[in-house]
Amino acid sequence: MSDLLTVENLRTSFHTHGGEIRAVDGVDFSIAKGGTLGVVGESGSGKSVTALSIMRLVDLPGRVERDSSITFEGRDLAKLREDEMARIRGNEISMIFQEPMTSLNPVFTVGDQIAESVRLHQAVGKKEADERALEMMRLVGIPSAEKRMRDYPHQMSGGMRQRVMIGMALSCNPKLLIADEPTTALDVTVQAQILELMKDLRDKLGMAILLITHDLGVVAEMVDEVAVMYGGRIVERGPVSEIFANPQHPYTEALLTSIPLLGMRYTTPLKAIRGMVPSPLDWPRGCRFAPRCDYAFDRCTTELPPLFEVGRQESACWLCESGPRAVRQAAAN
């Protein structure tokens, strides 16, 4: 299956009085047509900036550096004029943001906001746009959709607002949907409903999904492949089942071992990842995870490892240079 989106050497920096913040620093990945990719990592790893960079929504003083490449159906989005990008944004590529209450305009009804998106990109009249808005509200499972079209955002629950955001994002039949933490502000029951809705719509509409999240449970539920980000770079990527079963990068392993498991005894301590994510103003010289890694050795602190192929996975760890990472006791032990 051919790739819909190919990102190569994506670098996004924020040029401030305090120095250059390299929030995204050489990211590469691709998404096939109809495929799903999850990008996971702690806060500050560069996940959301990666999504905003693809959409060309990074505000000043940030910028996507010139040697970055974001190829979508043969067009390099990083090189397009703003008017050309505006025809793609919200039309061929749509994005769902983290918090629907702050993403929706409080002074317009939700129906008007969906219809406005349709009119902007589809060049249709008000009647056709309103009909499309009603169709989308029904598609995303909003009950009494015709009545709820006249509601304002504050009159809807968090789950219903997120359904509106999904309906707005899908109103122009995008080929790629970027979902940035789409369930963060929702309770567990509503999270499950939203994830099930997104899976159903993906299968029904045949779109590709780039899912940004810190929740490994969401990743296991939703995606085919996963890319693990740390310190502005991808440190591991591959099929989600293989990464969960046999993580090759110590950071991925640390994320997985910090999750409580069903049936775990309350006396069993969870393993926390020591330390903090380093500042993007001053990334460590070698592997950016080395100061927190239980397996680090001298080379880790002086040389930045590339992604090594490990079967169907790739891992940016010197322990994988010659193949799968050897199972051994952590250096801290």
What does each of the following model-derived ranges do?
Residues 3, 143-146, 237-333:
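Short catalytic/signature loops enriched in Gly
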Residues 63, 77-94, 112, 120, ...:
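ABC ATPase NBD coupling module
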Residues 171-175:
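A short, proline-enriched helix->beta-strand linker immediately N-terminal to the Walker B motif
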